[in-house]
Swiss-Prot record:
Primary localization class, coarse: nucleus
Upper classification of the organism: Eukaryota, Metazoa, Chordata, Craniata, Vertebrata
Name of the protein described by the UniProt record: Neurogenin-1
Organism (species): Homo sapiens
PANTHER family (alphabetical): BASIC HELIX-LOOP-HELIX PROTEIN NEUROGENIN-RELATED, NEUROGENIN-1
GO BP annotations, alphabetical order: auditory behavior; axon development; cell fate commitment; cochlea development; cochlea morphogenesis; craniofacial suture morphogenesis; exit from mitosis; forebrain development
GO molecular function: chromatin binding; DNA binding; DNA-binding transcription factor activity; DNA-binding transcription factor activity, RNA polymerase II-specific; E-box binding; protein homodimerization activity; sequence-specific double-stranded DNA binding
Chain ranges passing through the membrane: none
């Protein structure tokens, strides 16, 4: 027993001496306290620093929403402006198209009036339609061209009429025309060159809209014999 007590006392003495030697070392609690003081002095802790961008992003979210709303407003304004611009463009194009069509019709009517002025005259209360005016002018020009062709060939008017007209029309012809009568010579050439007597003529009988019972159109500026004996003018009687 005394030996054991001596060993315990010696151990305690050694521990006290070693504790006095290790007094310069820090304990765990003191080490943690010093680390906390150093971290607080140097700045916020690492988790706080990591959370800083999240806070800034949260503060930037309202600004981003405002920018998005502003962009949507601008898009809506642009859409409204574009629709108004398209409407104005369509309206201006429609107005221009109407003006072009109106000018075209005015020019067409003026040209037809000029054509009617050079054709054989009609009564004041008679006015041909557009297609009738064109057909009549075509036949009139064709008869004049055939008259000039026969005049160049030197064929006598009566002989040409008898040779070119159908046989059933020959007994209805008047007597031989006078050489000094320009109107009768024109009538003989027109009768010889009638588009109704020539199958190759482009103006066929079915092209005319007149019936045999239609009213007779009078031509004050031309002789009556010429109008009644020229088959190309029969549809207009």
């Amino acid at each position: 027993m005394p030996a054991r007590l001596e060993t315990c006392i010696s151990d305690l003495d050694c521990a006290s001496s070693s504790g006095s030697d290790l007094s310069g070392f820090l304990t765990d609690e003191e080490d943690c306290a010093r680390l906390q003081q150093a971290a607080s002095a140097s700045g916020p802790p690492a988790p706080a620093r990591r959370g800083a961008p999240n806070i800034s992003r949260a503060s930037e979210v309202p600004g981003a929403q405002d920018d998005e709303q502003e962009r949507r407003r601008r898009r809506g304004r642009t859409r409204v402006r574009s629709e108004a611009l398209l409407h104005s463009l369509r309206r201006s194009r429609r107005v221009k198209a109407n003006d072009r069509e109106r000018n075209r019709m005015h020019n067409l009517n003026a040209a037809l009036d000029a054509l009617r002025s050079v054709l054989p005259s009609f009564p004041d209360d008679t006015k041909l339609t557009k297609i009738e005016t064109l057909r009549f002018a075509y036949n009139y020009i064709w008869a004049l061209a055939e008259t000039l062709r026969l005049a160049d060939q030197g064929l006598p008017g009566g002989g040409a009429r008898e040779r070119l007209l159908p046989p059933q029309c020959v007994p209805c012809l008047p007597g031989p025309p006078s050489p000094a009568s320009d109107a009768e010579s024109w009538g003989s050439g027109a009768a010889a060159a009638s588009p109704l007597s020539d199958p190759s003529s482009p103006a066929a009988s079915e092209d005319f809209t007149y019936r045999p019972g239609d009213p007779v159109f009078s031509f004050p500026s031309l002789p009556k014999d010429l109008l009644h004996t020229t088959p190309c003018f029969i549809p207009y009687h």
